[in-house]
Amino acid sequence: MKRLFALTACSLALLLGTAPLLAACGDVQTDEPALELPADDLPVLPDLGDPDEPELDAPAEETEPDEPTDEPEAEPDVPVTEPEPEPEPDIPVVSTRAEYIYVCTNSLNVRAGAGTSYASLGAVNSGDMLHLVRRVGSWYETRYRSKTAYVSASDAYTTIAYLDKGSEQVERVIAEGLELLGVPYVYGATRLHDGKGNMLKGFTVTKFDCSSLMQYIFYQGAGILLDVTTRTQVKQGVAVSWNNIKRGDLLFYTNAQRYNKTGVERIGHVALYLGNNYILHTASDYAVIEQMSATRKAYFVTARRFF
């Protein structure tokens, strides 16, 4: 047993290379000669390092990321083109006022052409108004008896007047009346229709009385069927007081012969109101636009509205 221990201790000393153990091996007495190991048979032990400190992995070297060495290609200069604005649509300017030729003198000739050498188609008086179509040099173009006509544009004879427009229907009715200015008055002239839309034979646009003129322009301009006399027309439409009359209303009057009658029998005349005290009607001579006289106002009975 001692021998085995001695071999073991010596072997361990040889393996570990520990001096105290080797010294101890020398003092051990055995009955057999000491075992000698050839130098070539000694194992080579690895260097285990300091057993008290743990082995640390060496930190990995930090490497910078590969950066591209090539410069990025420059973007080509693209010209900035501003989009062209879309053209605005032409919006017609709609006037809210109607233009008229206001007559400043009595017996002003209405001529067939723009000059004194043209034939006279008729005459208008101070305070009357005509439809203004346009100015042609020193003349105003108008419509008279359904024809193109002219009056002097001299400030001594005429000027321009304005009236506020009404609805589209109202203006169409008035336009029909403007065509007929200057047409002679004939009492009892044949009507356009019988009040129910049945057209009558013998009708012509060359003569009118007050109710047949209103019947014609209301039908042509707005398709409205007025009856055949002032005393039946006054029952149509909606009643309007004097203080509320406006452009396009029909104004009904009495006269000297009917002044003392009652009901519809008082009615003896009808006119189309244009505004600012002006009416379009025909009475005793021809169709005209004129201001209401004091007498005409005194004969006013009622107004009727259709628009």
Task: Locate each region found by the language model.
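Sec-dependent N-terminal signal peptides of Gram-positive bacterial secreted proteins and lipoproteins
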Residues: 3-27
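N-terminal capping segments
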Residues: 159-211, 219-227, 262-266
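Boundary regions of SH3-family modules and the immediately adjacent low-complexity/disordered segments
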Residues: 26-56, 61, 67-70, 74, ...
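Low-complexity, Gly/Ser/Thr/Pro-rich intrinsically disordered linker/tail segments
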Residues: 301-307
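...with weaker cross-activation on analogous glycine-rich loops/strands in unrelated enzymes
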Residues: 174, 215, 224-289
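Glycine-rich catalytic cores of cysteine/serine-nucleophile enzymes that process amide/ester linkages
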Residues: 123-128, 134-137, 149-153, 183-208, ...
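Beta-loop motif signature
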Residues: 34-43, 90-96, 103-137
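Sec-exported extracytoplasmic/periplasmic mature domains
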Residues: 129, 135, 178-186, 215-223, ...
